[in-house]
Amino acid sequence: MATISSIDSLRPLTIGLIAGETSGDILGAGLIRALKAKVPNARFVGVAGPLMQAEGCEAWYEMEELAVMGIVEVLGRLPRLLKIRKDLTTRFTELKPDVFVGIDAPDFNITLEGRLKQRGIRTIHYVSPSVWAWRQKRVFKIGKATDMVLAFLPFEKAFYDKFNVPCRFIGHTMADAMPLQPNKATARELLGILPESVCLALLPGSRHSEVEMLSADFLKTAQLLKRNIPDLHVFVPLVNAKRREQFERIKQEVAPELNVHLVDGKAREIMIASDAALLASGTAALECMLAKCPMVVGYRMKPLTFWLAKRLVKTPYVSLPNLLSGEELVKELLQEKCQPQKLADELLPLLQGSEKVGALKQTFLHLHKSIRCNADEQAAQAVLELAGK
């Protein structure tokens, strides 16, 4: 007669996963692929997007159920979100997966991870929240809720180490996806840019508030640069039709005569093709560094938001290239310093190929290598170790 333990030993490796947005779906799919390569009969179940489902993850709920942004939207959906979390707690407790992996979505996942850990289920939080930058006390909640944090960046691991929270630096999936030496000629050919053209990328952000706050200053900066470089080509990749419409309206008000190339998507190709970029901070700055494109970061927010941020944020820089290097590798012009003349003064030498550009690209390459560690594989290894496999 089979015992419970012998039945358990026959059960395939079972991994619970929750992804709450598209970026998490991409990470989840990569993790599932890497795990299936090692354990072909493994079972994956939880909240998944289309990419994770295509890799064989069984979806108890669709990812869109969790993908809500903004306080008003979250409040409107709160009863449903709480009901889903309660149901998931019950179902995962009954299933007892070998490991539960919460992918990003910290406000939803970390509480759930804590409940599952209390019930004897091993938990991983994949993608560190920015606890090193602000609301640092969250690290204690994360430490109680998880057996392991998987971090993209080395300074994140250093932060968790200070608080004795188990953390593994796995490198960044974007660094894995992008070549160490991007092909500028190919990118220019794709975009129809001549090899000898001088090219500037403007990336005023992906959120409505960013495009509203930054576009006018960015366009005025391009106008100033055109005085020095009359044949300057200006490319603006926009994430969707709404942001394009918004940017076009602002351009019509601020710089109707300025000739710019508006492109749907293709931000990465534009970064690779460009001689310099002016961008909002965020993931775009990391992507631009990996594209080996010199950049200036310009950022504005509402005065009260900035006042609060200055008091809450504990880091000397806002952009990832600077946080990775521990110095102001990339010029950051924030709030009242984010004005066209100052931005243009910083960008002009980059566009003209000053001596600084070669050294900057070498540093970008060094930083790229430091976070290019095959993150999917590293994440899979961490899951298997925690599962005792």
From Swiss-Prot:
GO terms, molecular function: lipid-A-disaccharide synthase activity; phospholipid binding
InterPro entries: Glyco_trans_19
Gene Ontology CC terms: membrane
Domain of life the protein comes from: Bacteria
An annotated GO BP: lipid A biosynthetic process
Class of enzymatic activity (EC top level): transferase
Reaction catalysis annotation: 2-N,3-O-bis[(3R)-3-hydroxytetradecanoyl]-alpha-D-glucosaminyl 1-phosphate + UDP-2-N,3-O-bis[(3R)-3-hydroxytetradecanoyl]-alpha-D-glucosamine = lipid A disaccharide (E. coli) + UDP + H(+); a lipid X + a UDP-2-N,3-O-bis[(3R)-3-hydroxyacyl]-alpha-D-glucosamine = a lipid A disaccharide + UDP + H(+)
Transmembrane segments: none
EC number of the protein: 2.4.1.182
Pathway: Glycolipid biosynthesis; lipid IV(A) biosynthesis; lipid IV(A) from (3R)-3-hydroxytetradecanoyl-[acyl-carrier-protein] and UDP-N-acetyl-alpha-D-glucosamine: step 5/6
HAMAP family from the UniProt entry: LpxB (MF_00392)
Family: Belongs to the LpxB family.
PANTHER family: LIPID-A-DISACCHARIDE SYNTHASE, LIPID-A-DISACCHARIDE SYNTHASE, MITOCHONDRIAL-RELATED
Role noted for this protein: Condensation of UDP-2,3-diacylglucosamine and 2,3-diacylglucosamine-1-phosphate to form lipid A disaccharide, a precursor of lipid A, a phosphorylated glycolipid that anchors the lipopolysaccharide to the outer membrane of the cell.
Protein name, as recorded: Lipid-A-disaccharide synthase
Source organism of this protein record: Photorhabdus laumondii subsp. laumondii (strain DSM 15139 / CIP 105565 / TT01) (Photorhabdus luminescens subsp. laumondii)
